[in-house]
Amino acid sequence: MEELSQALASSFSVSQDLNSTAAPHPRLSQYKSKYSSLEQSERRRRLLELQKSKRLDYVNHARRLAEDDWTGMESEEENKKDDEEMDIDTVKKLPKHYANQLMLSEWLIDVPSDLGQEWIVVVCPVGKRALIVASRGSTSAYTKSGYCVNRFSSLLPGGNRRNSTAKDYTILDCIYNEVNQTYYVLDVMCWRGHPFYDCQTDFRFYWMHSKLPEEEGLGEKTKLNPFKFVGLKNFPCTPESLCDVLSMDFPFEVDGLLFYHKQTHYSPGSTPLVGWLRPYMVSDVLGVAVPAGPLTTKPDYAGHQLQQIMEHKKSQKEGMKEKLTHKASENGHYELEHLSTPKLKGSSHSPDHPGCLMEN
């Protein structure tokens, strides 16, 4: 590990000119062509083809999540244990059924050629990802690792005793912002017992923004609804639209941008069909002229963050994923598959280096 740290340290230049945050990252174009372009674009193409033939039983999957009923699943898991190369202690500590249910992003390194036509962007607040399950008169919030961190009543269908029936259950992908006591709704996987996993992104978003306002009082904080539920808006990914978005004022502290392919289904786990960028990266990565403002101002760690992304991606290509993932978990430098901002350990600029806000 000591040798690895030295090797990584030696690959970072501390020259003020070379790593100036006012200029594009010096190795960005080289990295994009060599390590990510074919890989990420090819994986996108294959996943879009695969989902046409892949039809999972999401009706039962949603019902199991809503009712916490996993009868018959234990025998299947027992058969898989011999094939899993995981540490036994880790398996015991992690929850089984509610873990890894969220669709997570990758850094958007390879710019899609159809970005303006086939992609949608969502501006995300600072917060933590949460799987929300409203069923049987109660609402539960789970982390991406499957831990239940809160149970409360809500005005979501199935979320409180007044509006709960056996078929009324709802499953949402949210970002919880503690400052505003709000669950910002990213996506919908199930609404009133109807699963939407196999629906395209543009339809899921349309449904979400049509149905959320119909639930009176859902966006207000009350005794029956102690946390607000607010749908996050989505925008086209044309250069003009991105410029408009980056000029807007939002009622929350912005963490970053999620880019969704319009045709992608909701698939739990990390996918190249959902990309993630910090707002200041848009000009360098997408080549879009952006307006000057709070969202596009590059922080002091901008050059270092791009360097971390590229080194991590390169290491995966060279078969060093396991070592660097362990290194990342120790130093908190990487949260590449989740929405976050890296914090440089021991940095003297701690106020300017927010921690991993989206997911710790």
Curated annotation (Swiss-Prot):
Region (Necessary for interaction with KPNB1 and m3G-cap U1 and U5 snRNP import receptor activity): 1-65
Residue span of region Necessary for binding to the m3G-cap structure: 208-328
Region (Interaction with m3G-cap structure): 127-129
Region (Necessary for interaction with XPO1): 1-159
Domain named IBB: residues: 11-73
Pfam families: Snurportin1, SPN1_m3Gcap_bd
Subunit description: Component of an import snRNP complex composed of KPNB1, SNUPN, SMN1 and ZNF259. Component of a nuclear export receptor complex composed of KPNB1, Ran, SNUPN and XPO1. Found in a trimeric export complex with SNUPN, Ran and XPO1. Interacts (via IBB domain) with KPNB1; the interaction is direct. Interacts with DDX20, IPO7, SMN1, SNRPB and XPO1. Interacts directly with XPO1. Its interaction with XPO1 and binding to m3G-cap U snRNPs appears to be mutually exclusive. Can form homomers.
Function description: Functions as an U snRNP-specific nuclear import adapter. Involved in the trimethylguanosine (m3G)-cap-dependent nuclear import of U snRNPs. Binds specifically to the terminal m3G-cap U snRNAs.
Disease: Muscular dystrophy, limb-girdle, autosomal recessive 29: An autosomal recessive form of limb girdle muscular dystrophy, a group of genetically heterogeneous muscular disorders that share proximal muscle weakness as the major attribute. Most limb girdle muscular dystrophies present with elevated creatinine kinase and myopathic electromyographic features. Disease is usually progressive to a variable degree, ranging from minor disability to complete inability to ambulate, and can involve the large proximal muscles, as well as axial and facial muscles.
Protein's name in the database: Snurportin-1
Organism of origin: Homo sapiens
Gene (UniProt): SNUPN
